A protein has these predicted regions:
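Short, surface-exposed alpha-helical segments at coil->helix boundaries
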Residues: 15-22, 44, 157-162
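Aromatic pocket-lining residues of Rossmann-like dinucleotide-binding sites
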Residues: 76-80
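Gly/Ala-rich beta-loop-alpha elbow adjacent to hydrolase catalytic centers
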Residues: 64-73
Length: 204
């Protein structure tokens, strides 16, 4: 059986990060998806085509995705033949995240609707179009999924991630000292141990 794990990076990442996962999926091919989408509507145009190109000729395809990449993947690839998904710090409720960001920036919904785009001090512009899209396109995800969440994640609350895991039937593992971006040696060791544990459980 030919097996493939497709890695989808988050903001600021790149497809080359997939190399980290090759030792964890030693009998699989592991490849990063080199994408250009910066919005969910762009991802819904681009991701299905890239997935089909990468998955051609494989009998089993798994997904590894992080942060905004996981959000894009869940919106655009829900109907693809994916056997397992491994999501690291996924954004699972974009509407909640945007409204939280509006609160941080002290921007009202009426103001955002009127102005369309508002710059913020924390670097992420608020966009009315994005908020509307998130509301009109909720995630509908039924693929067997394992989630790794950081106790110090500043983008997704524990309440939000727990509710999503319950709704989708996903397993949820929490690294209490972890951050949204898993990058320190301790965090990466925890991530690797998590992959090994849930992968082996899924193959049992």
């Amino acid at each position: 059986m030919k097996r493939l794990a497709i890695y989808i990076h988050g903001k600021g990442g790149n497809a080359g990060e997939a190399a980290h996962y090759q030792p964890l999926f030693a009998t699989w091919s592991v490849v990063g998806m080199a994408y250009h989408a910066q919005t969910p509507w762009e991802a819904c145009q681009e991701f299905p085509r890239l997935f089909d190109q990468l998955a051609e000729g494989y009998d089993d395809v798994a997904l590894i995705a992080g942060s905004i990449g996981a959000y894009f993947a869940m919106l655009s690839l829900a109907d693809k033949p994916i056997s397992q998904a491994y999501l690291i710090s996924p954004v699972v409720d974009m509407e909640r995240l945007i409204t939280d960001m509006m609160g941080w920036a002290r921007v009202t919904e009426e103001e955002l609707r009127r102005r369309g785009v508002i710059a913020t001090d924390f670097g992420e512009p608020l966009k009315w179009e994005y908020l509307c899209y998130a509301r009109e396109h909720p995630i509908a995800w039924r693929i067997p999924t394992h989630i790794l969440y950081a106790g110090q994640d500043h983008l997704t609350t524990r309440e939000t991630i727990t509710a999503f895991a319950v709704r989708t039937g996903a397993t949820l593992t929490v690294m209490e000292a972890g951050e949204h971006w898993f990058h320190t040696p301790e965090q990466m060791a925890f991530l690797d141990a998590w992959v090994n544990r849930v992968r082996d459980a899924g193959e049992a």
